[in-house]
Amino acid sequence: MASATVVSQIQSLYIIKPRLSPPPPPHRQFRSIYFPTTRLLQQHRFRQMKSVVIVPATAAETARKRYPGESKGFVEEMRFVAMKLHTKDQAKEGEKEVTEPEEKAVTKWEPTVDGYLKFLVDSKVVYDTLEKIVQDATHPSYAEFRNTGLERSASLAKDLEWFKEQGYTIPQPSSPGLNYAQYLRDLSQNDPQAFICHFYNIYFAHSAGGRMIGKKIAGELLNNKGLEFYKWDGDLSQLLQNVRDKLNKVAEQWTREEKNHCLEETEKSFKWSGEILRLILS
């Protein structure tokens, strides 16, 4: 799970005109002075045409402006919003202005094994929670994300066992992981769109920036030992694409307002993940 801050340091109008058609001509067998003449019909049509009022189209009639990435599917919208939350130094699409002290660039990258273990332990708490929520599927859409191949809980358990065998003491989960896990449980009960935002950002960030961090930690602290946390069974790019397809399928059932609500949760996802990531430097 990589935060926007720390990861970077490692690197028309429709006008409806009435159709004016003359009344049907009278049946020849019943010609009468009461039927209008051709001249009268022409005058009637002219008066009708002069009375046509052109009014602006309603909002529903006007073509809706598409959101960035919308034409490619909702996942592309999510990616676009996530990239905007980076600074210009972190990504070319970045628009975020640094306003908080914790958002400032890390001037000293000095990870420790103890700090990294805290990060792994708290990460496992979050992945355990995600996988249980998806497995229980209190909301029907969650079932779509069972057994995606992106699950990390079992891999983290193996890594923590390896550290234990090397003589390290495994710490207890701390507040960043415990609080985030509780937040995810609460969201999953009443706010599926917001929960799925976190699901997407956690798994996809780990597959990108998370791997960069893992490689750097392995080189600096673990004698290039590759952890299971950064390994997947099968082609990772295909696993990610399968989940993208599922996310797009689920989002097709949402209203535009629900989609926007999901996107608005992105910044909170970055905040929670960033707190766990900073444990590496503790």
Curated annotation (Swiss-Prot):
Any one biological process term the GO annotation gives: photosynthesis
Disruption phenotype: Reduced symbiotic nitrogen fixation (SNF) in root nodules associated with an increased superoxide production, and development of brown, rather than green, nodules during senescence due to the accumulation of hemes and melanin-like pigments instead of biliverdin (BV) in the periphery of the nitrogen-fixing zone.
Source species: Lotus japonicus (Lotus corniculatus var. japonicus)
Disulfide bridge partners, by residue number: none
Function per UniProt: Key enzyme in the synthesis of the chromophore of the phytochrome family of plant photoreceptors. Catalyzes the opening of the heme ring to form the open-chain tetrapyrrole biliverdin IX with the release of iron and carbon monoxide (CO). Produces specifically the biliverdin IX-alpha isomer. Can form complex with heme, is ferredoxin-dependent and its activity is increased in the presence of ascorbate. May affect the plastid-to-nucleus signaling pathway by perturbing tetrapyrrole synthesis.
InterPro entries per record: Haem_Oase, Haem_Oase-like, Haem_Oase-like_multi-hlx, Haem_Oase_decyc_pln
Family that this chain belongs to: Belongs to the heme oxygenase family.
Ranges that cross the membrane: none
Residue span of the annotated presequence: 1-56
Protein name in UniProt: Heme oxygenase 1, chloroplastic
Protein residues bound to heme b: H86
Listed Pfam families: Heme_oxygenase
Induction: Accumulates in developing root nodules upon inoculation with the symbiotic Mesorhizobium loti strain MAFF303099.
GO MF assignments: heme oxygenase (decyclizing) activity; metal ion binding
Gene label: HO1
Gene3D superfamilies named in the record: Heme oxygenase-like (1.20.910.10)
Catalysed reaction, written as an equation: heme b + 3 reduced [NADPH--hemoprotein reductase] + 3 O2 = biliverdin IXalpha + CO + Fe(2+) + 3 oxidized [NADPH--hemoprotein reductase] + 3 H2O + H(+)
Entry EC no(s): 1.14.14.18
Keyword rRNA-binding in record: no
Tissue: Highly expressed in root nodules and, to a lower extent, in leaves, shoots, roots, flowers and pods (at protein level).
Record keywords: Chloroplast, Heme, Iron, Metal-binding, Nodulation, Oxidoreductase, Photosynthesis, Plastid, Stress response, Transit peptide
Top-level EC class as recorded in UniProt: oxidoreductase
Superkingdom of origin: Eukaryota
GO cellular component term, pick one: chloroplast
SUPFAM superfamilies per record: Heme oxygenase-like
Main location: plastid
Compartments where located: Plastid, Chloroplast; Plastid
